[in-house]
Design a protein with these regions (language model features):
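A mobile "lid/hinge" subdomain adjacent to the ATP/sugar-phosphate binding pocket shared
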Residues: 180-216
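Short glycine-rich, Thr/Ser-proximal phosphate-binding strand/loop in the N-terminal lobe
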Residues: 2-46, 58, 159-166
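ATP-dependent carbohydrate kinase catalytic cores
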Residues: 99-129, 211-216
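Glycine-rich phosphate-binding loop of actin/hexokinase-like ATP-binding domains
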Residues: 131-188
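Gly/Thr-rich phosphate-binding beta-strand-loop-beta motif of the actin/hexokinase/Hsp70
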Residues: 1-26, 137-152, 195-202
Length: 216
């Protein structure tokens, strides 16, 4: 059995694939528009062909897939795309290898305890504080996701991921209430599509004509 493993980061807009032979190793990276493939299985097959791998038996030693949606019983339906992914079906496609399927922010949460100073960029000129407590990862992309890493032992961490983008927002001013006509949840306004909605809301408030595409 080979030490090569497929790793994939599957989002609502793009899906990234690569090959890993060990911690910190990543090669054969390819990026595909999620909407450009009918399913994850098709995207995976395209990737295998693109890197010239398979169908030789044993070329792949396993797969790790991080997907933008809630994972339940080894399967996920992407929150912002039509794809569904089953770890069992992916395993069958790859010859019965082990397949790990996790939420994309859970994968980021697993990384948090291993980040070094060189991996970080302080925001606002504030010096980096010593990271001794819980940590949170937030991702603003096609949607909005978050995960928390909580220390449960000397070197052990528990990762809790959730669909934070579906939390409701509550306006506190008349201006915010006007904006909320364009979206009611965190993800409605703080995401790739949400930026357009925020712009549309403020433009309408200023009497500026804009494309209706930005309002949806």
């Amino acid at each position: 059995m080979t030490g090569r493993r497929i790793v994939a980061d599957v989002g609502g807009t793009r899906s990234r694939f690569g090959i890993s032979r060990g911690p910190g190793d990543l090669s054969e990276i390819r990026v595909y528009p999620t909407a450009g493939q009918s399913s994850f299985a098709e995207a995976l097959a395209t990737y295998v062909i693109d890197i010239g791998a398979g169908p030789a038996e044993g070329w792949c030693g396993g797969a790790y897939i991080a997907a933008a949606g809630p994972v339940d019983r080894g399967a996920v339906q992407l929150t912002n795309a039509a794809w569904s992914i089953s770890a069992r079906e992916v395993s069958q496609h790859l010859g019965g290898v082990s397949v790990a399927l996790v939420n994309d922010l859970e994968a980021v949460g697993l990384l948090l305890p291993h980040l070094q100073a060189a991996d970080l960029a302080p925001i606002g000129g504030v010096a980096r504080a010593e990271l001794i407590g819980s940590r949170i990862a937030v991702n603003v992309g096609t949607g909005f996701g978050a995960a928390t890493a909580v220390r449960v032992g000397g070197t052990q961490w528990a990762i809790a991921a959730g669909e934070a983008g579906h939390m409701s927002l509550a306006p506190t001013t008349a201006e915010e209430a006007a904006v909320f006509g364009f979206g009611r949840t965190v993800e409605d306004l703080l995401s790739g599509l949400g930026i357009g909605r925020l712009y549309a809301a403020h433009a309408r408030g200023e009497g500026v004509l804009i494309s209706r595409v930005l309002e949806h």
